Design a protein with these regions (language model features):
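A generic, well-ordered mixed alpha/beta core segment in the N-terminal half of proteins
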Residues: 96-147, 151-159
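Conserved small/polar residues in nucleotide/adenosyl-binding loops
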Residues: 160-165
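A generic local secondary-structure boundary/capping motif
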Residues: 6-9, 123-126, 155-159, 175-180
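Conserved "HGTGT" condensation-loop signature of ketosynthase/thiolase-family condensing enzymes
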Residues: 1-106, 168-178, 187-309
């Protein structure tokens, strides 16, 4: 069996493991966006009939997995490993989804890079003979993420004035122009060592780049340096240039992060005129009030499985 070749930070796959099938599921805002027609399933109910936002995210991921297997005509019993992650603490949504799916499971937490991480690790496992049928998936849910990370008082509990009579207070901060909207979406890919489908030729694992961006409402600026560093290493390791590719996709830098990415690469002598950010195309920024664009693990996962594939 051919061995994966390592060149710098990049793994070069010799057998081209393939994405044999993919499925994307989204919520209400995604159903109103420009890519709505390319989802496998959409719901106007962001709870998806579940009792909580967190349970809804579990449903998102489970539904994407089952649709993916259905499209591949593969019984779930033949899945040898699932690599999955989400934005909840300790991969809660993924763990509960995999409890119902009943397949071997390894949880991933790469936040917005989870889908790419799953594809890279999955391709390496497939080429190495560790799995013949492997699922890579990721999800996020706007309300679950807001409750956990950003505005717990608004989505989780009530803050009361004192003394009595107690009056509930609502969280009323204005979203800044650099802020992004966490996608309520999930995507799932079925990876196989060989066969019909889109081949995975290489994978570059990025390095942490900390430019001391401390604005919690500007994640695009925080992520752009790592995106630039990863692309620079990929081009160096593979001996390729940006213009050789039909398109260069990033996950969810948003409008602000995408502009910074282009500036950082231009400073290194690279122009990426063929760049598209998944967070910039999932929603219509002018019509849907998402500020700088979409974000979250489910953003690029759904765009990959629904739009790109």
């Amino acid at each position: 069996m051919p061995m994966t070749v390592r060149c710098g930070d990049t793994l070069l796959f010799q057998t081209l493991p393939v994405i044999a099938a993919g499925a994307a599921v989204g919520g209400k805002k995604e159903s109103e966006g420009p890519l709505a027609a390319e989802f496998d399933e959409l719901s106007a109910d962001n709870r998806f009939g579940q009792s909580s936002w967190e349970a809804a995210e579990k449903y998102l991921q489970l539904r994407a997995a089952r649709l993916c297997l259905q499209k591949a005509a593969l019984p779930q019993e033949k899945v040898q490993l699932a690599l999955a992650g989400d934005l909840q603490a300790q991969c809660t949504a993924s763990s509960y989804a995999m409890r119902e799916l009943g397949v071997p499971f390894a949880g991933l937490f790469g936040a917005c890079s989870t889908m790419a991480e799953g594809l890279a690790l999955g391709a390496a496992l497939c080429e190495g003979g560790a799995a013949r049928n492997l699922l890579a998936m990721a999800s996020s849910h706007f309300c679950a993420a807001e409750r956990q990370f950003r505005t717990p008082l608004s989505y989780g509990c009530l803050l009361y004035t004192s003394p009595s009579p107690r009056t509930p207070l609502s969280y009323g901060a204005v979203r800044t122009p650099t802020a992004q909207w966490t996608a309520t979406a999930a995507g799932c890919c079925l990876l196989q060592p060989q066969g019909e489908g889109v081949g995975i030729a290489a994978a570059t694992f990025g390095r942490v780049q900390d430019y001391q961006v401390k604005d919690i409402n500007n994640m695009g600026a925080a992520m752009a340096p790592a995106a630039a560093s990863t692309l620079l290493h990929y081009f160096k390791d593979t001996g390729t240039e940006p213009q050789e590719f039909d398109c260069i996709y990033t996950g969810d830098l948003g409008q602000v992060g995408s502009q910074l990415l282009r500036e950082l690469l231009a400073a290194e002598g690279l122009l990426i005129k063929n760049h598209v950010d998944c967070g910039c195309i999932l929603f219509d920024a002018n019509e849907q009030s998402v500020k700088s664009g979409g974000s979250g693990p489910g953003c690029c996962a759904a765009v990959l499985c629904g739009h790109i594939l």
